[in-house]
Swiss-Prot record:
First-tier enzyme category under EC: transferase
Active site: D24, N72 (proton acceptor)
Domain of life: Bacteria
Protein's name in the database: Ditrans,polycis-undecaprenyl-diphosphate synthase ((2E,6E)-farnesyl-diphosphate specific)
Cofactor requirements of the protein: Mg(2+)
GO biological process, one term: regulation of cell shape
Organism (species): Aliivibrio fischeri (strain ATCC 700601 / ES114)
Subunit structure: Homodimer.
InterPro entries noted in UniProt: UPP_synth-like (IPR001441), UPP_synth-like_CS (IPR018520), UPP_synth-like_sf (IPR036424)
Enzyme Commission code: 2.5.1.31
Amino acid sequence: MTSQINNEFLSLDVLPKHIAVIMDGNGRWAKAQGKPRVFGHKAGVDAVRKTISAASKLGINAITLFAFSSENWRRPEEEVSVLMELFITVLSREVKRLHKNNIQLRIIGETSQFSSRLQKKIVEAETLTSENTGLVLNVAANYGGKWDITQAVRRLAYQVERGNLQADDIDEDLIASKLTMSDLPEVDLMIRTSGECRISNFMLWQMAYAEFYFTDQYWPDFNEQSLADAVAWFVSRERRFGCTGEQIQALMNEKDQ
């Protein structure tokens, strides 16, 4: 039987260090309102802001948002085009806000497939925030977990081919060192919105020991309270004692003062 804990015993030490989020349900959210899918993608940007703000207030080390998977290229061309333009617009508009809040932005994925215009924006945004020491915000764009593992193994294969590495020396730690986000803690909490219960080729290696939290909320409806509820669930799972979203909100407020 679990017991409710007092706020004084709830510290930042029990919170997840790295949260991954599959932002799902933009299209269905828009459809429910009689709007085109792109309307949902634009509304989802506000949910991103709220989630980043909440994670930063809680002192989370890193948060990784699944913005565009390598499979998303199969969507209708018009929708993909709108998503790319939205990505450019959001990067241009939000990067100064991120920088002001000491947030370091990283774009992970096969970015070479993006337009030169978008690649330039990515480099500019990452460069501006590269020295920031607060929350690390990873945006997974044209990313897939299989791709990440493949590129890591390929890099090691090149080293073996050149005679700089023996095949027998390859172990889990060496592979992990070649993955994206290798300098960050492994994911301990994965959140997926919209009621879907799958990980969709997202961070397959890094989420090996993560707790999975699924919510029926569509992504545009996700907010600070939503993240607080997910983190409270994580604390209850990890520490085997009761925790509420209100307690997590109280921690946010303490950080905000």
